């Protein structure tokens, strides 16, 4: 087909994946030939992790040694290098230069050892060093690997190098020319190279297979002893012929030489790690179309040729789920026989050693939802069962548990797979490299006259680059970019979001080519809607492969099918022409989203339900659990309602698109902002990605109008881009938490895209995106709190962030880095402290600080422009010298009001300079947190002395220190003095008992300042509480909040507490969680609650051993009490009958309860309905298992 400007958009152009991997797609009913030649970079997910990188120059031996070295952590690897330097310096024959060892990473070091020592000595030296480091497990693993990777037979050693280009089907001299030509980026030369490669591959295939068979001879001879060597050879010969032909058909085997590092990586995929874990299942996961199936097939071929798993597996069987599903019932025996050359497989002999079998299950996603319908398992490999039962049984190691598995699955299917698979190792398959992606977009997607401008546009569009990892999507994007470059006939939207690019492709393919009209007629629109309906039902049912019945149900006949083939949207399956798939899953998601828009044309806009028979309403997506497999459909739906895409859609359809869909999507996002407690970080991030697809600033602003606080997990570049775009249009945002992980390269000197011209290499792509994100944070007019807890930031990232937060317009008052990894760039923070006059609170909890860091911090705090009021240095690994510096700040900083050193080894020695500072009249500190600091009674003596003279300190936390009764006695003596200003005292888990309570009771008698006391997790027992109650009944005691969690209390103390509840005019909160009060104890408390004089507003009865027997008394008390607003009843054993009584009390008009701690799921449906009715009757009531307070920040001051 041709468009204006002479642009040729034939089938070959459509699927030209990259300069190095050209493939073609025919327009007739033949195979869809997808380009699936992924690079296999270092990236693993889930348990257990192994780090991998590949290099074309690595031999199996050096790669095996590299695998062992990757087992070392950073410190161990440095130790290994030091020991190697020592050994090398002592050697008189082969010494490696010291500087080369010092500068080598894992890959280089493995190569250096092989270069200077040779394979055998390299392994022996490494094993010796492992033993010196006392790494016995790794040493044993290395010995096993040495035997496999460094055989004595020199010919075998050559075989282990991996096949040469002359010995692999489809690899020839032309491929080398093709690789060189690709670098020159000339389409004509690339085409010539591909033609030459095709001819050469055809001429040499027979010779290469023969050579591979000769190579296999030695291996076959070794297995002959097992009694079926001939059978093995026949099977391998059959596999080589079959899979070599498949690779040749796909035209994707020209990169085999470059892919050999993948094979080397997979060679060790089943090896034990340093902890002794050895998986029997390896999962290859990645994006749809990334090349997982191609890699799986290549594994089979590589094994058959003798290059992989020799000596480990006698047989490797390829089980494509899609083809297996065609039979209602089968057995493992039948599947094996079907793969055998003459269908007469020696099954008994094969199954006699299951530990030498490898099954490759390709396409776990193709099972769809069938696994949800049946949980049956099978143990007999000869028994006939539905294919999904056999697959589940293999995955769960019920069937042939000793065998090994490789499973391919899309990223979106990994969560479902995790519930089926047993102890797997996950390996991520990533697509083509950044350099290849840029080449692809420059050569295929941008006109020659736009190269310079286009390169800058590509570099700025990280989403576009990221999606081009998948060759099929990259091909589609290239065509779309070309369409957008054409002016005139094309109706493509000028929008470079993925929705815009997919729309450019699909709308162009659907547009009639006639001169008279450019829009679809009614009949064509009906066909389009039917087709899109099939797509949407496939999305919801997790179905991506369709058969004739699916087409028939939707009323799609042969003529419509031919049209879809011609448009390269729906294609015959590459493995079976009776089935049909979309060119890529993203096209199915796009068409599914388009269905909702088409449906709205036939219904009044205000009533548009976005509903089909087997799907969910658009507004029910959140409530129904919009699973990850349908995320892109939702994102495309948002993109379709944007102005840039809607206008060309209206041209195509020949009628206006109603706005009902847009209004419902707007409402869905708004709901997330209105219910922040019910919104997960993933929900918010998903909404941001959806909004990003619209590129409509006004729409985004309206959607985010209700958002005041957000939590975003930033795990990839696209998350950062979408978040940056949305947050700058979030008008009332006040608090944000961002967990940034995995987006910054470990080696900051590494260039992300070497193909980029030198004049554009001043910053990496991610640095530019991060700078934009930080600029938004620094200039947002309403943002007051930034939490980067758990983030991993490099030195450059920290420098950029801090530079933006120093901006005069930055309004941030609270900056939090709790448990963040920012040590390399922490020095940049102190300039913010001095420059940003709005910053009031800084939390560095969990950040390791050196003495120099603390010195710089103290210098910043001394600066006259510093107005910091709160500093948290929890668990920062501080030393005694640090406390000396910090104590000096307490006497010189007029602004610092709160200091936390929790989790540091302050000890009694460190408390002394801090106490000295507190005694100085210039000290303005009000809150001091010394939780878990190793303080004893000796340190209490210093603190007690400071409390006497200090007039400012009102909050003191000494929890989790071994103070004992003696230490508390010293503190209480000071607290009894009139000059002590202490108001809140935390003594949780300080080894206090009844005697300690006696000292505290004496202190309370003469202290009118203390209002909050926490004694949780101390064995004070009933007698201790009774001593406190004696004082609390007195009007002179002003205690408002008493925490007695897990204090070994029983019903014996409840009468005393009840008396306090009824008589005290000050006690507002009492927490008795995790004490064995029982029904009798609570009944006694209820007597106090029923008294009119009770002012208690908050009562904690979690895990107090309550049953339905106390519900009557509790209900009566709740009905009478008008002050109690918060009640925690979690983890108690109430029957439905008892809960019905409580629900009646909750709903009573005289009850003022607003926060009720209960696990709804713990009770039957009828009780859950009653609780929901309470919330409908009283909308302000919160019923939740996570009991909280309206004054969380104030109540838990020592935590925030």
Swiss-Prot record:
- Ranges that cross the membrane: none
Segments forming domain Pyrin: 57-148
Output the Pfam families linked to this UniProt entry: LRR_6, NACHT, NLRC4_HD2, NOD2_WH, PYRIN
The reported result of mutating residue 71 to A is: Impaired formation of the subcortical maternal complex (SCMC)
* Location of region: Disordered: 142-232
Compositional bias, Low complexity, is annotated for 192-202, 209-221
InterPro entries membership: DAPIN, DEATH-like_dom_sf, Leu-rich_rpt, LRR_dom_sf, NACHT_NTPase, NLRP_HD2, NLRP_innate_immun_reg, NOD1/2_WH
Which positions does the entry assign to LRR repeats? 704-727, 730-753, 780-803, 809-832, 836-863, 865-892, 893-916, 950-973, 979-1002, 1007-1034, 1036-1059, 1064-1092, 1121-1142
UniProt's post-translational modification comment states:
Phosphorylated by PRKCE.
Q: Name one GO cellular component term.
A: cortical granule
**Stretches with biased composition (Polar residues):** 173-182
Do you know which SMART domains this protein is assigned to?
LRR_RI (SM00368), PYRIN (SM01289)
Output the Gene3D superfamilies linked to this UniProt entry: Death Domain, Fas, P-loop containing nucleotide triphosphate hydrolases, Ribonuclease Inhibitor
GO MF annotations in UniProt:
ATP binding; structural constituent of cytoplasmic lattice; tubulin binding
One GO term under biological process is:
establishment of organelle localization
Q: Where is the composition biased (Basic and acidic residues)?
A: 142-152
Disease implicated: Oocyte/zygote/embryo maturation arrest 19: An autosomal recessive female infertility disorder characterized by reduced fertilization rate, oocyte maturation arrest at germinal vesicle stage, and early embryonic arrest.
The UniProt subunit note reads as follows: Component of the subcortical maternal complex (SCMC), at least composed of NLRP5, KHDC3, OOEP, and TLE6 isoform 1. Within the complex, interacts with OOEP, KHDC3L and TLE6. The SCMC may facilitate translocation of its components between the nuclear and cytoplasmic compartments. As part of the SCMC interacts with the SCMC-associated protein ZBED3. As part of the SCMC interacts with the SCMC-associated protein CFL1/Cofilin-1. Interacts with PRKCE. Interacts with TUBB3 at cytoskeleton microtubules.
**Protein name in the entry:** NACHT, LRR and PYD domains-containing protein 5
Q: Which organism is it from?
A: Homo sapiens
Q: What is the lineage of its organism?
A: Eukaryota, Metazoa, Chordata, Craniata, Vertebrata
